[in-house]
Amino acid sequence: MRTPLVMGNWKLNGTKESVSALIKGIEAAADAAKNVEVAVCPPTIFIEQVANLVANNSIELGAQDVSTNISGAFTGETSPVMVKEFGAKYSLVGHSERRQYHNETDAVVAAKFVAIQANGLVPVLCIGETLEERETDKTFNVVETQLKAVIDVSGIDALENAVIAYEPVWAIGTGKVASSEQAQDVHAHIRTWLAEQSKVVAAKVQILYGGSVKASSAKELFAQPDIDGGLVGGAALLVEEFVGIIEGAK
């Protein structure tokens, strides 16, 4: 049985005051949801603050991005070792905004995936298609290609200790949400494709849905057999919304 995971990606948002208020606002719901894992991925500058805030509750900590490098002359980068030192469990990798705005190729994503695992973190591998790719029936090809790029480097068994997040790019920050049927269709395809490589991995790996998840849509989405939770963007910044999403995962 796969444990539902609700993960908030705060992106480039927050202040010292708002970060504290947000954690305090969601911690009771996170602690009460015994069968749901809750995690947050703050901007790097807030990782130490959040680590202290979640030290005595059940909320897990994640990074939004890390470097493939551990140390050295890499201005502006953050290594997986650094975030691990502050108690992080997860790191996102391959988010569509990293792919789009930072030109991260499948090869770069694969290298980061390996570096994340090698340094004791759990990678949350983000995959998904653009609107143009969906409208030209390329969704399945896109997610397979993005997965294969990682598996070719890491091996299929590495996904036993990883999370996959399917995020249709056309639904991120747009207010558009894939219907529960559309999302389940892609999640089921991902799991079936993985089963061709390893039935063990396919049965075990959590596949999250990411793309304008809201409290109003969470319960129906998470009721689908191959949707194991959500990677939540804007709604993760709102206490009531995020609590509602956690409730929807129970």
Swiss-Prot record:
GO terms for biological process: gluconeogenesis; glyceraldehyde-3-phosphate biosynthetic process; glycerol catabolic process; glycolytic process. Its main location: cytoplasm. InterPro entries: Aldolase_TIM, TIM_sf, TrioseP_Isoase_bac/euk, Triosephosphate_isomerase, Triosephosphate_isomerase_AS. The keyword Cytoplasm applies. It is an enzyme of class 5 (isomerase). Pathway: Carbohydrate biosynthesis; gluconeogenesis; Carbohydrate degradation; glycolysis; D-glyceraldehyde 3-phosphate from glycerone phosphate: step 1/1. Homodimer. Involved in the gluconeogenesis. Catalyzes stereospecifically the conversion of dihydroxyacetone phosphate (DHAP) to D-glyceraldehyde-3-phosphate (G3P). PANTHER family: TRIOSEPHOSPHATE ISOMERASE (PTHR21139:SF42). This is Triosephosphate isomerase. It comes from Psychromonas ingrahamii (strain DSM 17664 / CCUG 51855 / 37). The gene is tpiA.
